[in-house]
Structures are given as structure tokens and as C-alpha cells.
Amino acid sequence: METVFDALKAMGKATSIELAARLDISREEVLNELWELKKAGFVDKSAYTWRVADNNVQQEQPAQAELPEEITTATVAKISECDLTATIEQRGPQTADELATLFGTTSRKVASTLAMAISKGRLIRVNQGGKFRYCIPGDNLPAEPKAASVSPLWLSASSSACHGVLIITVITPSPTKNSATKMPEN
């Protein structure tokens, strides 16, 4: 009967599923044997593919980054808007990538979590040097050119559900050439 090692040597490289099909045994048995061979230094693993090792020298410890195939699903940490907002308050303006690194999650998850805070006015997103940074309104924002003419001001108030803070935002419309300034309708 052909062994897992012999089959892998004949195939060059293969997945555990391919080896199980060739040997007509369960995938679990193949995986157990492959991990034993890996610990002994006879096979190597990259992603989901196994191959015979170049050198048959015993490795002292397998790499910690490599996990069995059943455990390779990524888990994304749960984060809340309050946690992200508190970090921005402490550390200043941050990009989604920087926040994702701090919280061990994806930048897409960070951006999605902060979208509601932006729409409610609890945070603003500012383009600085080609990167969008999330900021607390009124804190160390980049200098913006002032409008030449005086325009009316409107106040918008919103309360932060996380910290019990009332944030007042001053809205100044930029004047256009052919339009009169109107009050926004709520």
C-alpha cells in the first residue's frame, strides 16, 4: 500500500484532499500524517499545498504562523464606534489603516463602523496628503481657506451616544455666483 509520503513524492505537490482521494483514506488521516511528516522535516506546506521538503533534515519547531487547514479561517475582532472614537480623541487624526492595525481588524470594517459617526457629525473625514483621516470636529483640523465674503452661520447640534457629549457644529455655506443664501430645510 502506498504511504502519504510516497504519494506526495509521486505527485510533486498536492492538497490534502487530492492525497486523500489518491490513497482512498479520510482527509483527517492524511492531515494527521502530513503534520507528523512536517514536524519531522520531510514535507513543507505553503497555503493549502503540501510538497516534499528539499532537505530531509529534522526541523526543531514548525513555524507558528502555519496552522492546520481546518483552523485557517480569519476572525475579525469586534469593534465599536465608541472604541474607535475614543482612540481618535486620544491619538488625534487617524487613517482607517492605522485604526485597523491598532484594533487588529480590517480597514474596511473600520470605515464601515465609522460611517454612521460621520453621517451624524460625531466625526469628520479629512483628506490630508492623499489619505483620508478621521478627526473629531474642531480638533487640529488642517487649515482651510476662508471665504472672502461674510455668510450666515447655522448651528447643528448632535449628542454622542457613547460619551454623553453634545457636539455643536458650525455650518457656513460657501457662496456661489448666481444663488442666494438659503436656510437649510430639516
Swiss-Prot record:
SUPFAM superfamilies: Winged helix' DNA-binding domain. It comes from the Bacteria. InterPro entries: DUF1627, WH-like_DNA-bd_sf, WH_DNA-bd_sf. Pfam families: DUF1627. Encoded in the Rac prophage. This is Protein YdaW. It comes from Escherichia coli (strain K12).
